[in-house]
């Protein structure tokens, strides 16, 4: 071992100074990752969680919480005297999103590559053969997230791989634990970790968390990690943890006058704002990317809705400075596409911009994010911190900028200051957008919309979804719909016309452009051919209705609404039959889902009950009615069971 390495490990704040000391292979991993010393949350957590104590950790975003629980969990599993029994789970890590669960899993896999016995088993995770048995303790992880694999496939992998640590989202974890093949007795199970606990509850996973806790022994170690402790999280702590030690890691900074103020973000992160009209936001983004020194390798731009992300991902390719690639990530993407896009962004070799919603605002530890831009301020001010925290992680310098429209929105700065999240006007790099810059950007976007009807329609949907999101903003005194400049907003989106919305009633929907939007074609030839055929059919039906009205016929025969009212009873009965068939299909689907959620013993008991009820009903149907009995026996009554009432 080189002398320099020994001296580095003995530095008071280094990893080697921790007591009890970390295993050499763990130190090798930390050194290879460039982590010279533990962060405050890691040091505080190691002192307690490595012992036999539950912990509740509240720490700012980007403070290194992932390693704060992964290292103690792995150490605990490897301290076992004997290898885990087959199909016995020793640890579970719960994450609110697929992306975060996948990231934790990947960090753990890279970590275990430095532990030779565990690294030897990692290739079996992707094979079809059972992993070999071991005579020494190892860590074998399995990732459980919905969308990418089916529950049956996860169970098959579990039976083949026999992992002792599960990492996943609440729904899929609860589903796997409900099977009789997965065992977590008190003799085997060691530790439970709930990461981003506040987010778990915000997303409505309380029922799944209750189910998971019910499957696990009460005698266990539990770690709860969160950026904030709400009342709901406090209730979860009461139910799921036993005499926990609370660890709160704060960041403090000096304000004017030497006043010490707590911060909820790392000191390495600069948080700023710019005041700009909506029409100038995209040009301002371009200037930030172009003028920031050094040039940002990875940037994240947050929008308020999925449709906005989808739209701007289509139109910004010709707007952003040369050399920047665009990747989109939002909740309406298929899980496989989301995972692929996330990997593209993380592994990008050239400057890349991620356009996303709040799906990427929590927990994701994306390396080397230099710039975060909030095109739309979040509807929940708590999310603001988490968005900013994607940059400036683990001591790396980062810049986070939020764009505010002139007027009442500038009050957002004071609101954040009250909530211990001070932001300052952006001074560097300088951003100075002119009206000509805004006109040029909108004209380029509009040219794309005029060339492809798909972009035109997507722009309309994106704008409507943004308006709905703005209306639902929690800070209604600051974000007021009545104060919006709709024409300027439309220019920022590059709209060819305002969509039909109650909020823009009475305004010139054409925006003074006088564009015949009906003539805009689809770039896809097949879609355009279908559109033209439907348009021609609509024109014929319209002409027929007008001709019938002119002749005094009233147009009932061709008007779809009136035709429905005057429909023959036979036709209505046919519709009722179709509806009844659909209801029956839905009932069977619900029943199948209910049976699928049962354990094997529960399904066996349900089958026996169904058979008994069917037999009783069959006998009841074959038995004579009371009237027939009376006629046949002269009114003599019997005590024969006549079945259940339906």
Swiss-Prot record:
It is found in: Nucleus, Nucleolus. CDD domains: DEADc_DDX55, SF2_C_DEAD. Residues 622-631 have a biased composition (Low complexity). A motif (Q motif) lies at residues 15-43. Residues 46-247 form the Helicase ATP-binding domain. Residues 572-623 form a coiled coil. Belongs to the DEAD box helicase family. DDX55/SPB4 subfamily. ATP-binding RNA helicase involved in the biogenesis of 60S ribosomal subunits. Binds 90S pre-ribosomal particles and dissociates from pre-60S ribosomal particles after processing of 27SB pre-rRNA. Required for the normal formation of 18S rRNA through the processing of pre-rRNAs at sites A0, A1 and A2, and the normal formation of 25S and 5.8S rRNAs through the processing of pre-rRNAs at sites C1 and C2. This is ATP-dependent rRNA helicase SPB4. The lineage of its organism: Eukaryota, Fungi, Dikarya, Ascomycota, Pezizomycotina. The gene is SPB4.
């Amino acid at each position: 071992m080189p002398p320099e390495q020994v001296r580095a490990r003995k530095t008071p704040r280094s990893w080697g100074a921790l007591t009890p000391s970390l295993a050499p292979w763990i130190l090798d991993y930390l050194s290879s990752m460039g982590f010279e010393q533990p962060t405050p949350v890691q040091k505080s957590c190691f002192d307690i969680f490595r012992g036999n104590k539950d912990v509740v950790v509240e720490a700012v975003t980007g403070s290194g919480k992932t390693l704060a629980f992964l290292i103690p969990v792995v150490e605990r599993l490897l301290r076992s005297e004997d290898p885990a029994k087959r199909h016995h789970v020793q640890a579970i890590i719960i994450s609110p999103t697929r992306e975060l669960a996948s990231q934790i899993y990947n960090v753990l896999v890279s970590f275990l590559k430095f532990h030779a016995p565990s690294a030897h088993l990692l290739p079996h995770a992707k094979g079809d053969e059972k992993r070999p048995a071991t005579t020494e303790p190892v860590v074998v992880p399995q990732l459980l997230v919905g969308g990418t694999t089916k529950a049956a496939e996860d169970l098959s992998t579990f039976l083949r791989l026999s992992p002792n640590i599960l990492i996943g989202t609440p729904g899929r974890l609860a589903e796997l634990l409900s099977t009789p093949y997965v065992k977590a007795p008190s003799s085997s199970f060691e530790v439970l970790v709930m990461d981003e606990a506040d987010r778990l509850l915000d997303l409505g996973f309380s029922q799944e968390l209750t189910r998971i806790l019910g499957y696990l022994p009460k005698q266990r170690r539990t770690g709860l990690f969160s950026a904030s402790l709400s009342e709901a999280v406090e209730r979860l702590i009461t139910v799921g943890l036993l005499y926990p030690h609370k660890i709160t890691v704060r960041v403090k900074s000096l304000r004017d006058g030497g006043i010490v103020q707590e911060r909820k973000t790392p000191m390495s992160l600069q948080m700023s704002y710019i005041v700009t009209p909506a029409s100038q936001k995209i040009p301002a983004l371009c200037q930030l990317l172009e003028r920031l020194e050094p040039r940002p390798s990875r940037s994240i731009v947050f929008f308020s809705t999925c449709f906005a992300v989808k739209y701007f991902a289509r139109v910004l390719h010709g707007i952003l400075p040369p050399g920047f690639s665009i990747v989109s990530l939002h909740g309406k993407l298929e899980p496989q596409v989301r995972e692929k896009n996330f990997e593209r962004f993380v592994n990008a070799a050239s400057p890349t911009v991620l356009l996303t919603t709040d799906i990427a605002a929590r927990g994701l530890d994306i390396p080397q994010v230099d710039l975060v831009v909030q095109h739309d301020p979040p509807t929940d001010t708590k999310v603001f911190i988490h968005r900013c925290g994607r940059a400036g992680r683990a001591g790396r310098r980062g810049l986070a900028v939020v764009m505010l429209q002139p007027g009442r929105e500038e009050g957002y700065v004071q609101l954040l200051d009250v909530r211990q999240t001070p932001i300052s006007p952006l001074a560097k790099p300088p951003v100075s957008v002119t009206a000509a810059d805004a006109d040029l950007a909108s004209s380029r976007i509009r040219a794309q919309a005029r060339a492809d009807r798909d972009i035109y329609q997507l722009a309309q949907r994106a704008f409507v979804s943004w308006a709905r999101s703005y209306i639902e903003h929690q800070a209604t005194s600051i974000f007021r719909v009545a104060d919006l400049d709709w024409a300027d907003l439309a220019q920022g989106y590059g709209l060819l016309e305002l969509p039909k919305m109650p909020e823009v009633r009475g305004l010139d929907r054409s925006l003074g452009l006088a564009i015949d939007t009906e003539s805009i074609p689809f770039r896809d030839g097949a879609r355009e051919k279908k559109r033209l055929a439907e348009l021609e059919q609509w024109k014929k039906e319209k002409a027929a209705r007008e001709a019938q009205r002119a002749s005094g016929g009233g147009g009932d025969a061709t008007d779809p609404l009136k035709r429905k009212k005057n429909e023959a009873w036979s036709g209505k009965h046919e519709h009722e039959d179709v509806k009844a068939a659909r209801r029956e299909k839905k009932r069977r689907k619900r029943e199948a889902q209910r049976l699928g959620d049962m354990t094997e013993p529960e399904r066996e008991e349900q089958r026996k009950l169904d058979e008994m009820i069917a037999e009783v009903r069959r006998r009841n149907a074959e038995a004579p009615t009371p009237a027939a009995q009376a006629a046949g026996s002269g009114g003599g009554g019997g005590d024969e069971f006549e079945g259940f009432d339906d």
